[in-house]
Structures are given as structure tokens and as C-alpha cells.
From Swiss-Prot:
Sorted UniProt keywords: Isomerase, tRNA processing
Protein's name in the database: tRNA pseudouridine synthase A
MF (Gene Ontology): RNA binding; tRNA pseudouridine(38-40) synthase activity
Enzyme class: isomerase
Catalyzed reactions: uridine(38/39/40) in tRNA = pseudouridine(38/39/40) in tRNA
Function comment: Formation of pseudouridine at positions 38, 39 and 40 in the anticodon stem and loop of transfer RNAs.
Active site: 60 (nucleophile)
Biological process according to GO: tRNA pseudouridine synthesis
Annotated transmembrane regions: none
Length: 274
């Protein structure tokens, strides 16, 4: 979606990876290290202007992203595709720009998105692994039945009012979510829970996973689970799964801006197949 060459102000889209361990989330906060603030400061240094970037989603403190999208505007002669290398040469090692391109003025990282997909990773091997520890919840206390977890996920497909899975402090005016995919799979010692929806409530996936683990080990029945979310019994949703297991996997748009190897297959192989 190229912009007119007569307009010196450009809108640039970015595909961003980050390791969330040492960030207080995506959104800029006073006196805190956040992904948005670090990228904004880096771009501002390059162009000599104060820059604001807009992300497709706001990940919480400690949550990772394999394919976050964002955009910013600036007055610069730098071609859109060159921004990836320019920023990667200046950004800290826990942020990586996988791709950049120029887009039209009506393209918006948040409002043009049709869906977001999150993956939660649980590592069930009894022995801790330092190379996996930062990116997965090490849960080995009891066996987890992925078929029970999938049975709990399937009824969530479609549009539902999921206020039971919304943390306090949310600024959303409603809790309606259109869940397009909800899948649980096991690969070796890993259990992956993936949720795709048009949008997500504050803390939704981690609250949901906390209950799914209880279902997977037989502590909570499928009937009890459905009663909780269908009747919005938020007071019974007491545990939020650790942030480190959650990753914003990818974001979908009507027209892909980048080839699949840039925005789609972006998580480390060992988290997919081990």
C-alpha cells in the first residue's frame, strides 16, 4: 500500500519480536522499561523527531511476542524496508524487528487487524531446563490430559461474553470476544494452548490457562468450567498462569504485508517440536 511520493510524511509498519522477561509490558509507562518506549526512543534518535508507535496488542509484563505488529509516522527519506536493519543496529538484544515496510495512511496496526493469536506453552518434563525456562511454565506436579483441555476449549468457539476471564482494571467497555480458534496439542514434553480471536480481554489467556490446568489434572470438571464462564462467576477464577509462558504469536490483516517467513513462523523450533 504505497503512499503518494508527494507527501513527505510516511507511515511505516513493523513486525516485532521481543523477549518480555525484562520489560514491564508493551505500553509506555513512566519510569518503566517497556517495549513501546524503547522502540519510540530509538526511532526518535534516528529521525530527530518525537515519534509515537501504535501496537496491534498490549502485552503484559513478562509476556513475549513472536509477531507483534506496530506502525509509526515520520518525515524521512528512509525507504520503508530499510527500517528493520536501521532499528536492529540500535535496539537492545531482547527486541528484534523482523520486517518493515511503508503502508498507506489508512492502515492501522490495531484497528486494521482482524485477529490476534496467542500461544501458551507448558513444559511438563520433571527436570528443569534452563534453555526453556524463560519461555514456558514448568508444570510437572501432576499429569495433564490434553484431551480434557481441548474438550474445555471447544465450546469457547464463537462469540461469547467472557467477563469471567477479565482482570480488574480493564478499560474495555464490554467483554464480548469472538473466538476463532482454540486448540490444545502435545508435542513431547510440551503442551501448547493456542487461542485466536478478534481481540482479547485484559489478562484473558493467562486466567483461562490457570483453569485449564485444573481441568487437565481432573481438579475441575468440564461442567463446572462451563458454569463458571457462562454465568460469569469471576470470583471462582482465582489463578493466573505465569506470564513467561505466553507469547503473542501473530496478528492477521485482510492483506498480508509480509511473506510468511517474516510474520508467521516466528517461534523457536524447540518450542514447537521438542
Amino acid at each position: 500500500m504505497p503512499m503518494s511520493q508527494a507527501n513527505p510524511r510516511k507511515r511505516i509498519a513493523l513486525v516485532i519480536q521481543y523477549i518480555g522477561t525484562h520489560f514491564c509490558g508493551w505500553q509506555r509507562q513512566t519510569a518503566e522499561r517497556t517495549v513501546q518506549a524503547v522502540i519510540e526512543e530509538t526511532i526518535s534518535t534516528v529521525v530527530g523527531q518525537k515519534i509515537t508507535i501504535h501496537g496491534a496488542g498490549r502485552t503484559d509484563s513478562g509476556v513475549h511476542a513472536a509477531g507483534q505488529f506496530a506502525h509509526f509516522e515520520c518525515e524521512s527519506l528512509i525507504p520503508g524496508y530499510k527500517w528493520a536493519k536501521i532499528l536492529n543496529d540500535r535496539l537492545p538484544p531482547d527486541i528484534n524487528i523482523r520486517g518493515a515496510c511503508e503502508v498507506s495512511q489508512d492502515w492501522h496496526a490495531q484497528f486494521s487487524a482482524q485477529w490476534r493469536r496467542y500461544r501458551y506453552t507448558i513444559y511438563t518434563h520433571p527436570t528443569p531446563n534452563l534453555f526453556i525456562q524463560p519461555y514456558a511454565w514448568h508444570y510437572y506436579q501432576a499429569p495433564l490430559d490434553e484431551t480434557l483441555i481441548q474438550a474445555a476449549l471447544t465450546p469457547l468457539l464463537g462469540e461469547h461474553h467472557l467477563a469471567a476471564f477479565q482482570r480488574t482494571g480493564s478499560k474495555r467497555s464490554h467483554a464480548w470476544v469472538n473466538v476463532q480458534a482454540a486448540e490444545c496439542s502435545r508435542r513431547g514434553s510440551f503442551i501448547h494452548i493456542e487461542i485466536q480471536a478478534n481481540g482479547f480481554l485484559y489478562g484473558m489467556v493467562r486466567l483461562l490457562v490457570g483453569m485449564l490446568v485444573d481441568i487437565g489434572q481432573g481438579k475441575l470438571s468440564l461442567a463446572q468450567f462451563q458454569d463458571i464462564w457462562k454465568n460469569e462467576k469471576r470470583h471462582l477464577v482465582k489463578y493466573s498462569a505465569p506470564a513467561k509462558g505466553l507469547c503473542l504469536l501473530r496478528v492477521g490483516y485482510p492483506e498480508p504485508l509480509f511473506p510468511p517467513h517474516i510474520w508467521f513462523d516466528t517461534q523457536p523450533t524447540f518450542l514447537l517440536t521438542h
